[in-house]
């Protein structure tokens, strides 16, 4: 995935009110930008980190800049915009990088399903004519090379796992796909130290047949690229 226009580089001053970040672009004026990330962003939004923002030409937008990437003090790139995880998952599903997630007869994004009419990130029909429901999560919380999800207690993530288990009970395939959006992460686990219930649900889901995969991406100011699968330990 390439960025349509060159990103503006600056220095993060602070992130606040979940959706806002102040960034200094070296013009003696701090600019308020849109932060497209509702998570805690632990280790991703420290003052002084380098930040890259895209620029919108839409005159109706209150904030013309969107914070896309951060670079921490170790030089590691982090994809801040969580929407890119789903886009990269779409690219992944068109490749053979993860054989179990390839060779689709049909593939569609953001489909409604189930009794509650929830929206799954990706729905497909695999080469064996089985329906497959894929939930995508962006992983940026790092402790050295260990990645964790979620970075805060997430009732929404609990709901998604319960729905994936119901998909399996209905006779279909269900996949939890972690897109690793932090250069330093080499493996992924549920964040039991943050959300113990989520970790328990992951183990339960795996025991009934929900599939777990993680794929690492590599970001630069020009593009985000798929790199390779990394281990998931439950």
UniProtKB/Swiss-Prot annotation:
Similarity annotation: Belongs to the SfsA family.
Source domain of life: Bacteria
CDD domains registered for this protein in UniProt: SfsA-like_bacterial
Molecular function GO terms recorded: DNA binding
Pfam families xref list: SfsA (PF03749), SfsA_N (PF17746)
InterPro entries assigned: SfsA, SfsA_C, SfsA_N
Name this protein carries in UniProt: Sugar fermentation stimulation protein homolog
